[in-house]
Regions:
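Alpha/beta-hydrolase fold catalytic core
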Residues: 1-14, 34-38, 77, 106, ...
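Conserved HGGG/HGGXW glycine-rich cap/lid loop of the alpha/beta-hydrolase fold
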Residues: 2-55
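Active-site loop/oxyanion-hole signature of alpha/beta-hydrolase fold enzymes
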Residues: 31, 40-84, 223
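Hydrophobic, aromatic-rich cap/lid helix
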Residues: 140-166, 182
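Short beta-strand/loop motif that positions the catalytic acidic residue
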Residues: 171, 177-179
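Conserved alpha/beta-hydrolase "acid-adjacent" motif
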Residues: 184-190
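Catalytic histidine-centered segment of alpha/beta-hydrolase-like enzymes
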Residues: 209-222
Length: 244
């Protein structure tokens, strides 16, 4: 698996990119917070140097959760860790947290996500038109690096009917939900509902911001994440516990 680490802080943060991005989506925040955490930055399947599935079913959200678990087990079993997701990365985290026996994080950073992919319209078409929509959305979000359009299309076909609303109340970890007030991809109502559904979540709404808060609102997002990480104790006694 293609994983890069950055930073020197005592906490580890596993940061998950969105449906069209790569780990580069997180780089503006990572560069700002290099002193606050050691960042574990995987490229999920179909991106960067990670595997490219031959079977379209391997773009299911559960397989992305496999990638996340592999990154955690490779890089975080000896340290306190936080999970951070942007856009689809939030959905990957929510899917991962449904698992029994998986290492649990000390906290969650959930940016520009949704608790119900079935109620989003990231793409409206299929076939060749979906590929064109993916190219248009990539340009709109100003992604530094982008996933192959076929990988994006295959992923969307697998995940577009998913709904995590029913599992939120079972998530005990502290969380911060960061969302743009004018997000056209994951409307702010999704972020508010996500924060309300979790057991203990704070929320920070960025006035006038859209979907690309990591790159367009880096300073404000980084400030909120720093405050949240400061609230998570990187105690040497911490072990990633599993849910039995």
């Amino acid at each position: 698996m293609d994983i890069e680490t950055r930073g020197t802080g005592p906490l580890r943060v596993v940061a998950i990119h969105g449906i069209q991005g790569t780990r580069s989506s997180w780089m503006p925040v990572v560069e700002t917070l290099a002193d606050a955490a050691t960042w574990v930055l995987p490229n999920l399947r179909g991106r960067g140097g990670s595997i490219v599935p031959r079977d379209a079913r391997d773009y299911a959200l559960g397989r992305y959760a496999d990638d996340l678990e592999a990154a955690i087990r490779a890089c975080c079993m000896d340290a306190t860790f936080v999970l951070a997701g942007w856009s689809m990365g939030v959905s990957v985290i929510l899917e991962y947290l449904r698992r029994q026996g998986a290492p649990r994080p000390a906290g969650l950073v959930l940016a520009s996500g949704t608790d119900c992919l079935a109620q989003t319209s990231w793409f409206k078409s299929d076939g060749e038109q979906l590929l064109r929509e993916a190219a248009d959305r990539e340009r709109r979000l100003g992604l530094r690096e982008a996933a192959d359009h076929a990988a994006v299309a295959g992923t969307w076909r697998c995940i577009r009917k998913l709904d995590h609303r029913g599992s939120l109340a079972a998530i005990p970890e502290p969380a911060i939900v960061i969302h743009g007030s004018d997000d056209p991809d994951s409307p702010v109502a999704h972020g508010l509902r996500l924060a309300s559904g979790l057991q203990q979540a704070s929320r920070h709404i960025i006035a006038g911001a859209g979907h690309g808060v990591l790159t367009e609102n880096t300073a404000e997002v980084s400030d909120q994440i720093r405050r949240f990480l400061d609230s998570i104790s990187p105690a040497a006694t911490h072990n990633p516990e599993t849910v039995k």
